[in-house]
């Protein structure tokens, strides 16, 4: 196929699509190369400034300070050497499949040269292109690079081959909140307070970085070996970058209110709703459609939304922890969507499951208009004065015992994850297209990453 471009003198110049694709790839490659140089220089300056600040706080002699500076310089040299090493799937041994999502799988793997255990997320490039997931993949990788703190699952490496994208992340053996809720049915108010507080701290931390998660749900709340929580799955996260924009919710938001009239499922008591929810929950987690149960109404409307949408999701999770099912659950996504959009009438608290007025009021403050929503004005500070969170040690909560202890027998214990006996351990692959590369492969340029701290693990 041929495409035309207009020259400066007004004449039309015709180029083949192949030529235009090559030109685009060259442009993106050069832009990323120089952007990386600037970023790396800035990161080195930040690490050096952090070291100098630490040296000022320590009572050291000048010779001791100089020794630490030399050690730091050596670490920087080792990191540059590590970055030049090409990492591939052959450097890891697959131990077990521990997760399946709509667009990929997660494996427990062991790095062959060090023996360290990681979680490897594998995404097929062809699927990402076909299902318009490139922006989501880019967003997840970029957020995991930037969000380097205790409330977000740590990514150590990202790399690619001609078929797949790979994210190498820390393995959190406690499983996820969805699995915990399916085991426990409901949590006590004390346990709910603990997990909602930790999730609030995690949400607040990414908001301070300028990101909105948009997909806060139990599946994406992972538990470490001590039972403390970390946020994961940033595929729908949005920030300030154009590459993170998405039309993910376009289909549902274009539906007319009349499309949902008369489709509401027949009323069920709370016990039947909980049983129905548990029966279908796992399948929803693995489907490409997913569930709209945790999505704020303003996200569906696409009239503009901000960080407040994550606080709505937190309120829905809090309701589920106490009731055994989310407030808007239905037999199908259309009914759920209708209930979310009509939350003033559908957010109800069944009398057969008694909860405190403080808990009820907190949920209502989360699940309300965006501009009045708890967390929408001052973030975490809004929560600290709420009676339900009375007694929470916000500064040291992660140092305290978790509400529900996690039993971990070894570094590769997967007992808190689902079993996938029918899934091969072999990394999924596909025939490489003629010519040796996937069309539009340039969209994955600059995906490769190695974290500075990883040199301590080598």
From Swiss-Prot:
EC number from the UniProt entry: 2.7.11.1
Segments crossing the lipid bilayer: none
Domain AGC-kinase C-terminal: 390-458
GO CC annotation: cytoplasm; nucleus
Positions of modified residues (Phosphoserine): 287
Subunit structure, interactors included: Interacts with, and is activated by, Mob1.
The protein's name in its UniProt record: Serine/threonine-protein kinase tricornered
Organism for this UniProt entry: Drosophila pseudoobscura pseudoobscura
